[in-house]
């Protein structure tokens, strides 16, 4: 659990200190991202330990998705620096998985065929932790279902996308609106799967770290050890929570 917290001397900074890890999983120092004259992020500074489970709240355009992209190495900051597990984001991408609005699934393939393909991409890197069949079962999908992903409902596509990113059981999981298009039962099942992910240490024995964005905080709260609210590219509020599920 997080034992203490505080604000650093950096502008707009929220820094979380913990005994979970001697080295932070994520460090952002005065990160800004500009698109022309629009500032998607404004001098955001943040330090998170391995094992943190962070829910990002905020209206559309608040900077949530941009923040995830920068941590994932899919976008670069205009100003400031980013460190993931002590290195540059792209250097650590083998330890990170991202689920965004684009599912990254091939419509003409079944879910199992999709996951077998993604598993083959990691065949020589020893990254695959789950079988494609198990990854699908874990999110409530039948691996034997012959239907193409293109014929799936939005909720089924969302679950198949989650199975894809959990296939390697990454050290850092970044989820952008994972509960969108899910009914309450499917959303609760996803929460349970993510709780299992958080409670299972990596092969190296380190705690897994989660950041997710959502417009449905009531669904995400069971996962959260920290809730951050963004507004106009700045972190404006935080709420720290005690998470018994991390000890399960």
Predicted regions: what is each one?
Residues 116, 120, 129-144:
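Conserved ABC ATPase "signature" region
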Residues 80-92:
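Conserved ABC transporter NBD signature motif
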Residues 57-59:
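The feature captures the beta-strand-to-loop junction immediately N-terminal to the Walker
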Residues 173-176:
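Catalytic Walker B motif of ABC-type/P-loop ATPase nucleotide-binding domains
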Residues 72:
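Helix-to-loop junction immediately C-terminal to a conserved catalytic motif
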């Amino acid at each position: 659990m997080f034992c203490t917290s505080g604000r650093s001397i950096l502008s707009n900074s929220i820094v979380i200190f913990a005994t979970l890890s001697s080295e932070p999983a994520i460090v952002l120092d005065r990160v800004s991202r500009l698109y022309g004259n629009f500032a998607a992020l404004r001098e955001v500074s943040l330090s998170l330990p391995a094992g943190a489970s962070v829910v990002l709240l905020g209206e559309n355009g608040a900077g949530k998705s941009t923040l995830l992209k920068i941590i994932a190495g899919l976008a670069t900051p205009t100003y400031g620096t980013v460190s993931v597990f002590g290195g540059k984001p792209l250097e650590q991408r083998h330890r990170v998985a991202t689920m965004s609005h684009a599912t990254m699934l091939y419509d003409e393939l079944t879910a199992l065929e999709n996951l077998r393909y993604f598993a083959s991409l990691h065949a020589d890197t020893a990254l695959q932790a789950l079988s494609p069949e198990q990854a699908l079962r874990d999110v409530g999908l039948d691996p034997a279902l012959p239907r193409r992903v293109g014929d799936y409902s939005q909720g089924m596509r969302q679950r198949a996308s989650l199975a894809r990113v959990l296939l390697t059981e990454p050290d850092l999981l970044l989820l952008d609106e994972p509960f969108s298009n899910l009914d309450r039962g499917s959303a609760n099942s996803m929460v349970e799967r993510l709780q299992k992910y958080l409670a299972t240490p990596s092969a190296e024995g380190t705690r897994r770290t989660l950041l997710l964005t959502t417009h449905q905080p009531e669904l995400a709260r069971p996962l959260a050890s920290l809730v951050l609210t963004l507004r106009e590219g700045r972190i404006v509020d935080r709420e720290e929570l005690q998470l018994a599920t991390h000890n399960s």
